[in-house]
Amino acid sequence: MVVTVYLLIVYDVGVERVNRVKSYLRTELHWVQNSVFEGEVTESQFRRIETNLERIIDRERDSVIIYSFRSERAMNRNVLGLEKSPLDVIL
């Protein structure tokens, strides 16, 4: 049985690394808004995402926060104002 987790990733990284982080996360998760991605992944994908982000960021200057939930249903998501990228839109 494949175990999945729902991730919410927010980041604040140096301007010289923003595009690398954003481009990488777009291959793995759904873009929500500036510096925020979310989506369901397997545990092995989760580990790969963490490893690849570690390779991109500068631990002395950058910040990446990863929230993990058992499922999307375990997370209450309430958007105030403009929703920049609704998750129900398929690209």
Swiss-Prot record:
Binding site for Mg(2+): 12
Keyword Hydrolase applies: yes
Family: Belongs to the CRISPR-associated endoribonuclease Cas2 protein family.
Example of a GO MF term: RNA endonuclease activity
Subunit: Homodimer, forms a heterotetramer with a Cas1 homodimer.
Keywords, in A-Z order: Antiviral defense, Endonuclease, Hydrolase, Magnesium, Metal-binding, Nuclease
An individual GO BP term: maintenance of CRISPR repeat elements
E.C. number(s) listed in UniProt: 3.1.-.-
InterPro entries referenced in this protein's UniProt entry, alphabetically: CRISPR_associated_Cas2 (IPR021127), Virulence_VapD/CRISPR_Cas2 (IPR019199)
Function: CRISPR (clustered regularly interspaced short palindromic repeat), is an adaptive immune system that provides protection against mobile genetic elements (viruses, transposable elements and conjugative plasmids). CRISPR clusters contain sequences complementary to antecedent mobile elements and target invading nucleic acids. CRISPR clusters are transcribed and processed into CRISPR RNA (crRNA). Involved in the integration of spacer DNA into the CRISPR cassette. Functions as a ssRNA-specific endoribonuclease.
Top-rank taxon: Archaea
Natural source organism: Methanothermobacter thermautotrophicus (strain ATCC 29096 / DSM 1053 / JCM 10044 / NBRC 100330 / Delta H) (Methanobacterium thermoautotrophicum)
PANTHER family the record matches: CRISPR-ASSOCIATED ENDORIBONUCLEASE CAS2
Name of the molecule in the record: CRISPR-associated endoribonuclease Cas2
Cofactor requirement: Mg(2+)
Pfam families in alphabetical order: CRISPR_Cas2
Xref: SUPFAM superfamilies: TTP0101/SSO1404-like
Broad EC category: hydrolase
